[in-house]
């Protein structure tokens, strides 16, 4: 079936296009091309037109009638299915209408969340191919999406349990925004910036929110003429922000994602060059590689690191263009990290490195595809100036190939490397494939390292296609194929599973790509061949040999895997998992080889496999299956020749062996008989037409063997029957050869070498289909009449009780029935019958769609409809068995299978289809060509895809009409699911779940039946039935969960039933399995529940589009437009639905309450019921009063679980009852009296100064309070003011406070009564101050919300009752009482937000003494809770309202009362409050700093640490971000200047600083130096604390402290050091990892140079360790500055000549590291310099006195000479994994110094020993670099005794 016609003028590679004037009247957007290749393709247009017309008409109707459910959902689901079956086969106009309609539906504000998700997923699919619709075709607004994201992802009520969203909702929404983004209007960018800029306050969580919104919403694909309305509005601002942030806050990674997207969408329109060094430095830092001698990682560097995927996209998009800067840096990046890829390295960072390797080539290939091969569309093309040139591609491949080759052998496996190589080989095969082969050939030879073999083979598989197709860049590629294949054969090894599997994959891959045809004869006939072609021709003579050797290997494998005798005895019919994988590998590889063979080679192979199979007798479990598979593969390739050999032989043997009738009744059959039956049953799985010749013989065999007594025998015979039926009735391709028409052509016409590696041509695929002929159908029915009919008659009589059958006979009959059913599933039409009506009311037709799958079901009434007959008989039999012999489980298992297949099976099983689809995708991925695209897959793969398309159609069953017959069978399954045997139940339940998913609305019919088993009033339910019913409710992991259908009608029944089932007599909590079931049920309901809608209103805009959709022509069905009556009726029904929903909701709540309040309900069920009730809290309805009362009473329940649920619930109820507060719009500029700034200035400006805390003007009187304009949210005004700035209106306009009981609503009265009752409150407080889990309890936000709600809704009504409790609790220092009072106080302070001034003032009169007491009673266990309490109290509150609190906390935090610990705690609590206030309290921060500064010399360690942390927060606001005004809060430079003044005494001293301070306050004045050391300790704590927290590091200021730290830091790792030294070391480690700005580099180097001249060798040593980390973590920033590189080089080389040995050695280590990461290069001046030093003459040895041990100070000459040797040694060690050209000579030079005095001799030995260690692995390779003489010297050195000395 070839699509002959192609539309004129279309690109021939784009299938589609109909000839001439379009018969369908529309041009499809983009069809699934594979449909055109199906054998029945000509029928599909009419079919799809009809379906599309129905969808448009009915979906339009449903929406106009406001019927979202069931009509709307039903037809949107149909649209999804349509999309899966035909692609986007609709006109552009319809496409736009569908999108607009779904967009409107998705954005209905009160839409139920599960519907929203359904619509959103469909909309995402419709928007997926953005090239199909341009911005002119479609425009979508952005605000509805923003409202939705805000409402759902930033929900204000979700945390209170008033809304339940599924976990998937975040991804769905983000993808939806991403899909709509290209279509946002041109002005969207400006509107978005206006909306979200005000959130950009870097100290606040809102910053994260702003950047998230920018990342997901900002459109970046606008055309160039609109760039001024797009990214140009924000690029400089955001990139400026990114460049200046130093400490990796969470949102930095999101900015990177945004820039990556921007860069990809606008290649060539943005100049990235100024940022390139910074980008690469940050990406390198993001890999978190371990560097330097001692490293401590900042934890947030790990958690907030960039996503490698996005970083890669960014790099790829910046490549190319005139400057080549990116390529230079990329090469630098790989140079610096290559050695980390070496297989000997491993760590948590390795995954990132591997991902980088895998993603980069992939990303470059995608870019090349887009620039060179992709069809142009409306999206902006890349300008020619910036397209990647061939040179760019070559440079890229060269810079990445080294690490990729190293990664082949990585510890994590070779997958990433193989994927990288696949993409690299597409671009530059000549650079990539040779080195891979160089590693592969030795790996194929090695016997000791099998992992090398698996790694190299999987990489060669990746490059196979590029290798075989050769092409002009790599013409010699194909010549490697045969040598590789021959060498791979030994890999078929029975003793090594993984080697075996990869070898199979390898051989299969290559043979798929190449016709195995011997072309050597062509050499004589033609003389126009190229050199390579001649070589290939002569090589192909080996193909036959290869095929035969492969077969011998397989035979060996089979013979070694024969079942051992021991296993033969047991009834294991299954192979082990590994055996079945080998079987699969073997059979698919062999079948691939035979498919690709020439006829000559095939005949030889056929004969060989035939001889092997008849000369042995195999057991049928393992070896037999493998041989039979090989035979089947042979027969499939050439049925005629093969069947001639096999069928007569097998039939003969079987007939011979069954001559004697005794055989029929034997329990154990002859092995030979079984083996031949097995063989025969497998070789009949071939083209049905070819089998017809042998039908008489085959039928005879069936007659002889179907009724054998031996189960193994008749099972094989049934297989034969099954395969005969399948072969004759199914539609399938009969060959998968790589070239259409096969290779059987004379060499003169056809030259196979031209077809090596050739892709299939979609247009001339020439699939050979097997379509059942009438003769075959007749034969199939003949088989059914002969073999199925008699069994059905027997079973029918057995079911009626007329015929006694033994169990074995029943099983045999059922086996025959089952095999007939699955053999002819395609022939038998689906079950027909009456539909089950009245399940759901709908005004739209809910009809099922019929798909044509290649067979007309015969109207021929003479033929029995066996599906219905089987159904009838099996149901009768089932009934009989369940009533009379329920323990016949084997028969029941089969009956379950039969029922499942009767319902669903039409020729293929879903799970098999899914796994084939998966493996199709894997093969596609492993061999696809992403560079050229255009579906250039090999032919076999394309055929497979068309076949999958056919199967997809046969499996499209969802949305089937639910008929009476289905109902009966599902009820049978339910009966089996609740029967006595657990295995029967389990199997029945799986089939039951599958059936429930297939039929529309059948769940509603079945639920009452399932719940029947749980009813407490039934006495006849057994425990097994009870358990079975619970499992039926629970569902399996993929299917429907009956307990939790998102539908009021259903959960109104199921939830109460689950709770009341606790009273059923079948329920027993003694049985752990039942307890576990209830736990699972409750857990699953909680996990899957999503808030169900109460309001199903459809917006006007939806209805308008729906009308257009219904009127849309081409295609359309004649359906009349809706009358106004219908529309009225629709509206009425929709209002009815809202009323019903509400009634159901209240019903459910009441029924659950009835259930929970039953007298003797076990506690477990009470808990489950309360849990379900708490799911029913909503934000659009207040809970019914009875439930409110229930929850409030349960605050004092005996069980803590219940109390916890009640606390959450009451907090939620209080939120429901919250009264709205009125807001007004203000103008901040008028209030401040300053005009609006002309450009953006963030931070402290005149127009936001009035928000600051100012003790001179805080509102202390009622008048001042009421005239103040309070702004509660801390971020407003920092960056910019919002367009519409709202604040709360004055007190008199707000809801009334101080209400009496009469003023309250009923719901409020319930709460009021309980909380005014002293007894109730006392009990509550007692419970709340109990300990829950010792040592694990923390401040509980739920309880805080409860109290906040109480004081917000009822202001101070309950204070009188609570006051005595608070006073009592505060005085009690127990952990749990303190925590309780902290929670209440936080709730009080936050709840008093809208109180009047008098009430607030009275509140603080009460609170201040309480807090003073509390802070003096603070303990180790509670300081965290008080910190949380104060932080929570200050969060999002105007600081001017809290002045009492701040003044209290600042009274004198370090009074010393209560000891140092209480001081530290007070500071902690204060810090919590101030940190929440961020930038709005500069005055308080200044006061605090002034107070702390004199106390920085505090002796106590805990206070010092706390002060350090407080300083971090004080200076947090001093940020160096762009467009930010200098801060009014304290600034670091001024502070540092004052500190340095005090540290002067330490700076001037040059010797080591020892820590002489004892940890106690000495008496009298301490000297300046001791004071200085104490100060220094605190400063260290401050610097360490701020390393991970602040946004920018004040480098200039810290630098002045560096020399001091260098002096203190210890050199060795020793934990016994005092705190000062440890801290100095840690602080240096953290500082060295800091990100530097380019202008800071010279400052740092200046300090390092100065310290390198210090007299303390500790300082000189530490300079080097600092340098190692600093350079690596700022690599490209330094490389970008030539002077800096020179300075560093000079610094390290000069320290090589230090008088102190340790410093010299560290300098050598540093040099070697800098060389290794390619920061410095080993050039000749350096080499000459070291060689000169080496030649320094040493002074003559003096005669020594016997008592004289040796020179203490080495002579200057010795130091110089040692420096030279160290330098050379550093060069050698800088290449641990290879041998550069200069190395052999250096090693020779070094060896000359083996006899020098110490420490030189030691250095040489160390160097040689390290060289040997690192180069030992690949010594064979490295040896090549040395001359013979050098090798002699070297071998001598490496093994000579002196080496071991």
From Swiss-Prot:
Molecular function GO labels: lysine-acetylated histone binding; peptidase activator activity; proteasome binding
Residue positions, PTM Phosphoserine: 1123, 1616
Keyword Acyltransferase: no
The entry's keywords: Cytoplasm, Developmental protein, Differentiation, DNA damage, DNA repair, Nucleus, Phosphoprotein, Proteasome, Repeat, Spermatogenesis
InterPro entries, per database record: ARM-like, ARM-type_fold, Blm10_mid, HEAT_PSME4, PSME4, PSME4_C
Matches recorded under Pfam families: HEAT_PSME4 (PF23096), HEAT_PSME4_mid (PF16507), PSME4_C (PF11919)
Gene Ontology CC entries for this record: cytosol; nuclear speck; nucleus; spermatoproteasome complex
Region (Disordered): 1-26
GO biological process: DNA damage response; DNA repair; proteasomal ubiquitin-independent protein catabolic process; sperm DNA condensation
Annotated Basic and acidic residues bias: 1-13
Subcellular location per the Swiss-Prot or TrEMBL entry: Cytoplasm, Cytosol; Nucleus; Nucleus speckle
Processing after translation: Phosphorylated.
Ranges of the HEAT repeats in the UniProt entry: 475-519, 1000-1039, 1181-1219, 1356-1394, 1638-1676, 1682-1720
Signal peptide start and end residues: none
Region: Bromodomain-like (BRDL), residue numbers: 1652-1740
Subunit structure: Homodimer. Component of the spermatoproteasome, a form of the proteasome specifically found in testis. Interacts with the 20S and 26S proteasomes.
Family: Belongs to the BLM10 family.
Known function: Associated component of the proteasome that specifically recognizes acetylated histones and promotes ATP- and ubiquitin-independent degradation of core histones during spermatogenesis and DNA damage response. Recognizes and binds acetylated histones via its bromodomain-like (BRDL) region and activates the proteasome by opening the gated channel for substrate entry. Binds to the core proteasome via its C-terminus, which occupies the same binding sites as the proteasomal ATPases, opening the closed structure of the proteasome via an active gating mechanism.
The record's note on its domains: The bromodomain-like (BRDL) region specifically recognizes and binds acetylated histones.
Protein name (database record): Proteasome activator complex subunit 4
């Amino acid at each position: 079936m070839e699509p002959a016609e192609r539309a004129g003028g279309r690109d021939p590679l784009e299938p589609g296009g109909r000839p001439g004037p379009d018969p369908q009247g529309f041009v499809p957007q983009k069809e699934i091309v594979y449909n055109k290749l199906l054998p029945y393709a000509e029928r599909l247009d009419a079919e799809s037109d009809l379906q599309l017309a129905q969808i448009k008409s009915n979906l339009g109707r449903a929406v106009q009638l406001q019927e979202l459910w069931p009509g709307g959902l039903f037809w949107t689901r149909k649209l999804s299915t349509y999309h899966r079956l035909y692609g986007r086969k609709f006109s552009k106009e319809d496409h736009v209408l569908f999108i607009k309609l779904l967009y409107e539906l998705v954005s209905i504000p009160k839409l139920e969340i599960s519907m929203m998700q359904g619509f959103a997923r469909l909309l995402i699919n419709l928007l997926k191919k953005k090239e199909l619709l341009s911005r002119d075709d479609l425009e979508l607004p952005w605000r509805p999406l923003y409202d939705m994201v805000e409402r759902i992802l930033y929900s204000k009520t979700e945390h209170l349990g008033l809304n339940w969203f599924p976990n998937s909702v975040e991804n769905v929404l983000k993808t939806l925004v991403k899909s709509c983004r290209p279509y946002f209007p041109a002005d969207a960018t400006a509107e978005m910036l206006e909306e979200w800029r005000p959130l950009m306050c870097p100290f606040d969580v809102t910053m994260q929110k702003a950047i998230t919104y920018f990342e997901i919403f900002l459109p970046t694909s606008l055309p160039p003429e609109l760039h001024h309305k797009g990214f140009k509005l924000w690029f400089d601002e955001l990139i400026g922000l990114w460049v200046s942030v130093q400490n990796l806050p969470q949102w930095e990674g999101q900015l990177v994602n945004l820039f990556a997207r921007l860069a990809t969408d606008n290649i060539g329109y943005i100049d990235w060059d100024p940022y390139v060094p910074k980008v690469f430095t940050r990406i390198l830092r993001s890999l978190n590689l371990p560097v330097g001698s001692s490293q401590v990682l900042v934890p947030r560097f790990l958690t907030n690191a960039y996503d490698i995927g996005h970083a890669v996209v960014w790099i790829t998009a910046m490549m190319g263009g005139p400057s080549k800067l990116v390529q230079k840096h990329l090469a630098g990046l790989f140079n610096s990290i290559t050695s980390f890829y070496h297989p000997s390295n491993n760590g948590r960072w390795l995954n990132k490195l591997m991902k980088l390797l895998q993603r980069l080539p992939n990303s470059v290939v995608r870019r090349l595809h887009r620039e060179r091969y992709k069809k142009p569309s409306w999206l902006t093309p890349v300008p020619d100036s910036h397209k990647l040139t061939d040179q760019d591609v070559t440079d890229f491949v060269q810079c990445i190939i080294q690490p990729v080759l190293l990664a082949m052998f990585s510890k994590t496996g070779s997958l990433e490397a193989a994927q990288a190589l696949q993409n690299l080989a597409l671009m530059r095969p000549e650079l990539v494939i040779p080195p891979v082969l160089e590693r592969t050939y030795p790996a194929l030879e090695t016997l000791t390292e099998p992992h090398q073999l698996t790694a190299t083979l999987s990489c060669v598989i990746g490059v196979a296609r590029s290798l075989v197709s050769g092409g002009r860049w790599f013409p010699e590629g194909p010549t490697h194929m045969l040598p590789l294949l021959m060498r791979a054969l030994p890999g078929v090894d029975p003793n090594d599973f993984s080697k075996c599997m990869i070898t199979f994959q390898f051989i299969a891959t290559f043979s798929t790509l190449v016709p195995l045809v011997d072309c050597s004869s062509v050499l004589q006939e033609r003389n126009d061949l190229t050199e390579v072609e001649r070589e290939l021709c002569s090589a192909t003579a080996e193909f036959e040999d290869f095929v035969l050797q492969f077969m011998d290997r397989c035979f060996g494998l089979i013979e070694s895997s024969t079942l051992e005798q021991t296993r033969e005895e047991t009834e294991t019919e299954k192979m082990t998992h590994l055996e079945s994988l080998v079987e699969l590998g073997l059979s698919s590889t062999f079948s691939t080889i035979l498919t690709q063979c020439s006829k000559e080679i095939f005949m030889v192979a056929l004969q060989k496999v035939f001889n092997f199979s008849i000369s042995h007798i195999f057991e049928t479990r393992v070896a037999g299956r493998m041989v039979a598979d090989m035979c089947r593969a042979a027969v499939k390739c050439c049925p005629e020749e093969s069947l001639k050999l096999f069928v007569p032989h097998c039939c003969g043997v079987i007939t011979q062996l069954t001559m004697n009738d005794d055989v029929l009744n034997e329990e154990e059959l002859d092995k030979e008989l079984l083996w031949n039956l097995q063989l025969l049953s497998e070789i009949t799985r071939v083209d049905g037409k070819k089998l017809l010749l042998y039908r008489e013989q085959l039928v005879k065999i069936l007659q002889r063997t179907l009724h054998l007594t031996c189960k193994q025998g008749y099972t094989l015979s049934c297989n034969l029957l099954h395969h005969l039926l399948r072969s004759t009735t199914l539609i399938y391709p009969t060959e998968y050869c790589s070239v259409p028409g096969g290779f059987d052509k004379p060499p003169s016409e056809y030259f196979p070498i031209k077809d090596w590696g050739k892709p299939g041509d979609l247009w001339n695929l020439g699939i050979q289909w097997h379509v059942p002929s009438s003769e075959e159908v007749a034969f199939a029915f003949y088989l059914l009449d002969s073999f199925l009919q008699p069994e059905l008659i027997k079973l029918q009589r057995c079911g009626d009780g007329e015929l006694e059958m033994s169990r074995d006979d029943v099983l045999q009959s059922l086996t025959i029935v089952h095999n007939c059913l699955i053999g002819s599933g395609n022939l038998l039409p689906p079950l027909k019958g009456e539909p089950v009506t009245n399940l759901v009311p709908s005004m739209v037709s809910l009809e099922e769609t019929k798909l044509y799958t290649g067979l007309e079901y015969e109207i021929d009434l003479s033929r029995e409809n066996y599906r219905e007959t089987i159904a009838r008989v099996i149901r009768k039999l089932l009934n009989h068995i369940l009533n009379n012999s329920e323990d016949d489980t084997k028969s029941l298992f089969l009956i379950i299978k039969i029922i499942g297949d009767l319902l669903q099976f039409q020729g293929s099983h879903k799970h098999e289809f899914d796994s084939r689809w998966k493996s199709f995708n894997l093969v596609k991925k492993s061999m696809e060509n992403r560079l050229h695209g255009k579906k250039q897959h090999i032919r076999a793969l394309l055929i497979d895809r068309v076949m999958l398309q056919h199967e997809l159609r046969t499996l499209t069953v969802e949305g089937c009409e639910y008929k009476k017959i289905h109902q009966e069978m599902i009820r049978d399954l339910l009966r089996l699911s609740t029967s006595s045997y657990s295995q029967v139940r389990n199997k029945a339940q799986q089939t039951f779940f599958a059936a429930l998913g297939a039929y529309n609305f059948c769940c509603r019919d079945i639920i009452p039946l399932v719940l029947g088993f749980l009813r407490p009033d039934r006495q006849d339910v057994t425990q097994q039935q009870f358990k079975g019913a619970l499992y039926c409710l629970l569902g399996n992991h993929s299917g429907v969960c009956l307990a939790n259908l998102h539908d009021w009608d259903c959960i109104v029944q199921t939830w109460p039933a689950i709770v009341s089932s606790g009273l059923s007599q079948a329920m027993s909590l003694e049985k752990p399995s039942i307890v576990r079931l209830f736990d699972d049920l409750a857990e699953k309901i909680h996990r899957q529940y999503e808030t169900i809608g109460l309001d199903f209103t459809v917006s006007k805009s939806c209805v308008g589009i729906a009308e257009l959709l219904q009127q849309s022509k081409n295609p359309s069905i004649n359906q009349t437009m809706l009358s106004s009556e219908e529309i009225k009726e629709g509206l009425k029904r929709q209002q009815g639905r809202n009323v019903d929903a509400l009634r159901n909701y209240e019903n459910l709540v009441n029924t659950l309450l009835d259930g929970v309040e039953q007298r003797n309900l076990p506690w477990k069920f009470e808990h489950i019921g309360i849990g379900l009730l708490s799911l029913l809290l909503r934000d659009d309805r207040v809970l019914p009063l009875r439930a409110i009362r229930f929850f409030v009473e349960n605050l004092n329940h005996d069980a803590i679980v219940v109390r916890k649920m009640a606390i959450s619930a009451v907090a939620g109820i209080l939120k429901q009852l919250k009264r709205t507060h009125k807001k007004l719009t203000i103008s901040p500029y008028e209030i401040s009296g300053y005009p609006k700034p002309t450009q953006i200035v963030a931070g402290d400006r005149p127009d936001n100064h009035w928000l600051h805390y100012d003790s001179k003007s805080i509102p202390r009187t009622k008048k001042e309070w009421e005239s103040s304009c309070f702004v509660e949210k801390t971020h407003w005004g920092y960056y910019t003011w919002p367009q519409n700035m709202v604040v709360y209106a004055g007190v008199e306009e707000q809801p009334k406070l101080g209400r009496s009981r009469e003023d309250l609503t009923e719901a409020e009265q319930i709460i009021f009564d309980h909380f005014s009752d002293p007894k109730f409150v006392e009990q509550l407080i007692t419970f709340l101050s109990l300990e829950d889990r010792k040592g694990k309890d923390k401040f509980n936000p739920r309880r805080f919300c409860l109290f906040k709600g109480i004081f917000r809704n009822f202001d101070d009504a309950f204070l009188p009752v609570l006051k005595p409790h608070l006073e009592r609790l505060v005085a009690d220092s127990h952990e749990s009482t303190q925590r309780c009072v902290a929670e209440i106080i936080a709730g009080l302070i936050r709840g008093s937000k809208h109180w009047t001034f008098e009430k607030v003032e009275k509140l603080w009169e009460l609170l201040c003494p309480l807090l003073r007491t509390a802070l003096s009673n603070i303990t180790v266990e509670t300081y965290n809770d008080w910190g949380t309490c104060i932080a929570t109290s200050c969060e999002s509150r105007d600081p001017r309202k809290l002045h009492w609190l701040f003044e209290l906390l600042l009274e004198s935090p370090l009074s010393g009362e209560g000891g140092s610990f209480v001081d530290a705690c007070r500071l902690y609590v204060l810090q919590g409050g101030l940190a929440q206030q961020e930038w709005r309290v500069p005055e308080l921060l200044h006061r605090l700093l002034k107070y702390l500064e004199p106390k920085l010399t505090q002796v106590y360690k805990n206070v010092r640490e706390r002060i350090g942390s407080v300083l971090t927060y004080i200076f947090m606001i001093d940020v160096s971000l762009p467009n930010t005004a200098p801060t009014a809060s304290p600034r670091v430079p001024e502070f540092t200047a004052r500190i340095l003044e005090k540290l002067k005494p330490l700076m001037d001293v040059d010797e080591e600083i020892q820590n002489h301070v004892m940890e106690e306050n000495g008496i009298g004045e301490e000297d300046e130096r001791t004071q200085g050391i104490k100060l220094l300790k605190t400063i260290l704590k401050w610097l360490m604390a701020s390393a991970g927290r602040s946004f920018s590091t004040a480098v200039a200021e810290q630098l002045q402290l560096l020399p001091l730290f260098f002096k203190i830091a210890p050199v060795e790792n020793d934990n016994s050091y005092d705190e000062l030294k440890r801290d100095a070391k840690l602080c240096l480690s953290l500082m060295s990892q800091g990100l530097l700005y380019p202008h800071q580099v010279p400052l740092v180097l200046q300090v390092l140079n100065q310290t390198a001249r210090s007299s303390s060798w500790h300082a000189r040593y530490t300079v080097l360790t600092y340098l190692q980390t600093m350079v690596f973590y700022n690599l490209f920033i330094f490389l970008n500055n030539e002077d800096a590189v020179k300075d560093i080089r000079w610094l390290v080389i000069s320290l090589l000549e230090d008088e102190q040995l340790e410093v010299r050695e560290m300098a050598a280590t540093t040099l070697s590291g800098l060389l290794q990461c390619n920061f410095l290069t080993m050039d000749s001046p350096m080499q000459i310099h070291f060689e000169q030093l080496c030649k320094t003459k040493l002074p003559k040895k003096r005669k020594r006195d016997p008592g004289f041990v040796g020179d203490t100070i080495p002579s200057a000459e010795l130091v110089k000479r040692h420096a030279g040797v160290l330098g050379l040694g550093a060069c050698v060690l800088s290449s641990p994994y290879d041998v550069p050209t200069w190395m052999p000579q250096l090693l020779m030079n070094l060896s000359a110094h083996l006899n020098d005095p110490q420490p030189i001799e030691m250095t040489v030995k160390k160097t040689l020993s390290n060289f040997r260690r690192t180069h030992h692995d690949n010594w064979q390779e490295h040896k090549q670099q040395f001359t013979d003489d050098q090798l002699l010297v070297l071998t001598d050195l490496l093994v000579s005794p002196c080496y071991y000395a």
